[in-house]
Swiss-Prot record:
Pfam families: GidB (PF02527). Belongs to the methyltransferase superfamily. RNA methyltransferase RsmG family. It comes from Borrelia hermsii (strain HS1 / DAH). Specifically methylates the N7 position of a guanine in 16S rRNA. S-adenosyl-L-methionine binds at residues 77, 82, 100-102, 141. It is an enzyme of class 2 (transferase). It comes from the Bacteria. GO terms for molecular function: rRNA (guanine-N7-)-methyltransferase activity. Keywords: Cytoplasm, Methyltransferase, rRNA processing, S-adenosyl-L-methionine, Transferase. The keyword Cytoplasm applies. This is Ribosomal RNA small subunit methyltransferase G.
Length: 207
């Protein structure tokens, strides 16, 4: 499975070293160790390969980040670190700010940042509605339906900035777009560059 992950990284144009792969393995073992205690992933996903698939799903967003080249990325609702920690492991060229309201998950994220030596990671414990800073690039993977949060996210998005939402089926995205299209200057849907059994699309919201 690790070989498949490395091949996928190459196909995505993501650089990696033996050190970054070792960090990924260490992180996955930590998720498995603390998963139940901190409610990091579902019980069905408390397996190495299952967590690795979450990591792969996280990293497929990297080409979009690379194309836009933001100085800093805000990951809203980071949870166990998907996609924020994973992106930070394989991309040390920019800063990743992980926003999470759960104290348990914040504790885990800060522990991972320290243990992995991720100097490009900053963890904030607060709800997105309480965030005051503005960001040029925002990622969200935790929200099933973006309609409830679109107006809040727009407030913390800089002019000309981009929200990249990890989404599923195309038809469900179209339904969500119909309710939020007036909030953004441009909206795009981009397919995942990695084919998998689970349909993955990216909803791109430009301010």
């Amino acid at each position: 499975m690790i070989n498949y992950f490395e091949l996928s990284l190459k196909n995505l144009g993501v650089s990696f070293t033996s050190e970054s792969i070792d960090k990924l393995k260490f992180y996955i073992k930590r998720v498995l160790l603390f998963g139940s205690r901190f409610n990091l992933v579902s019980k069905n996903d408390l397996r190495f390969d299952a967590v690795l698939l979450h990591a792969l799903d996280s990293v497929v967003g990297f080409p979009i980040i690379k194309d836009n080249n933001p100085h800093q990325v805000l990951d809203v609702g980071s949870g166990a670190g998907f996609p924020g920690i994973i992106l930070a492991i394989f991309d040390n060229s920019r800063k990743y700010v992980l926003l999470e309201r759960s104290n348990k998950k914040v504790t885990f994220l800060r522990m991972m940042s320290l243990e992995l030596g991720l100097d490009n990671v900053k963890v904030l414990e607060r709800d997105v509605a309480d965030e005051k800073d503005k960001y040029e690039f925002i990622t969200i993977r935790a929200f099933r339906d973006i309609r409830e949060y679109a107006s809040i996210l727009r407030l913390i998005l800089k002019n000309g900035g981009l929200i990249m939402a990890y989404k599923g089926r195309f038809d469900k995205i179209k339904f969500e777009i119909s309710h939020i299209e007036s909030l953004f200057s441009k909206i795009e849907i981009k397919e995942s560059a990695i084919s998998d059994a689970k349909e993955r699309n990216f909803l791109l919201l430009y301010k």
